[in-house]
Design a protein with these regions (language model features):
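P-loop NTPase Walker
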Residues: 1-84, 186
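ATP-hydrolysis module of ASCE/P-loop NTPase motor domains
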Residues: 59-62, 80-165
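Active-site catalytic microenvironments for nucleophilic, acid-base chemistry
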Residues: 21-25, 49-53, 77-81, 98, ...
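Conserved helicase NTPase motor core
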Residues: 1-10, 34, 63, 96, ...
């Protein structure tokens, strides 16, 4: 089912109501439903709405995660079942990533980057990863910085040297696991026969692929 409607028209309420219908009327186990939304704040809001509407009839709230929460779940399962822990740490401090971009910009052009420049460059980096672009596509991006391909390559190298990954790398890692380990893909397909996505219009190419 694809629900298209203007902002503020009640799409999320419809999705929460559908979850209640699936659990209370159809008898579907909450463990069989994976519900995804765009932000952590949105997951909490959906859980609150569900409890308000169906708390007495459906005391067990279905799993609601962000796409990065799903990616983390995939990586954790891979670690447990294949005995290979992730050697990389997801960087939660955005300032650390911004500093890497700032330092690289200064090295490449000999100038200090303004906050707006850093923001635009980080948006470009995220866009490349979310749209799964190749090296040949980097020069065509309108980032306002001619040396963006070099900065992008050095940014990823800097993360690898620190054994770090950003949230976009986390999705790439999860997608790679699903593509290369059919048993893990089958596990999640069997575990969650029902998938509900809120704010689907904000889904990027790699998020859709996962």
């Amino acid at each position: 089912v694809l629900l298209l409607a203007v902002p503020g028209s009640g799409k999320t309420t419809v999705l929460v109501t559908r979850l209640g219908y699936m659990l209370c009327c159809c008898g579907i186990s909450p463990d069989a439903i994976l519900t995804m939304t765009y932000t952590k704040a949105a997951t909490k809001e959906m859980q609150k709405r569900f409890v308000r509407l169906f708390g007495q009839d459906c005391p067990q709230v279905p799993e609601i995660r962000t796409i990065n929460g799903v990616s983390s779940k995939i990586i954790d399962f891979y670690t447990r079942t294949h005995g290979s822990g992730s050697a990389f740490t997801v960087v939660e401090n955005e300032g650390e990533l911004a500093k890497i971009v700032s330092d690289l910009y200064r090295e490449l052009c000999g100038e200090f980057a303004t906050q707006s420049v850093i923001k635009e460059l980080r948006k470009g980096i995220a866009y490349v990863k979310n749209m799964m672009l190749g090296k040949e596509d980097l020069g065509e991006l309108d980032t306002g910085f001619d040396q963006f391909p070099d900065l992008y390559a050095q940014y990823n190298l800097a993360l690898r040297q620190r054994r770090w990954m950003d949230y976009d790398d986390q999705m790439i890692y999860a997608k790679t696991i699903l593509e290369n380990y059919p048993d893990i893909l089958a596990h999640f397909q069997d575990a969650f026969p029902y998938i509900c996505v809120d704010e689907a219009q904000d889904t990027s190419k790699i998020q859709h692929a996962i």
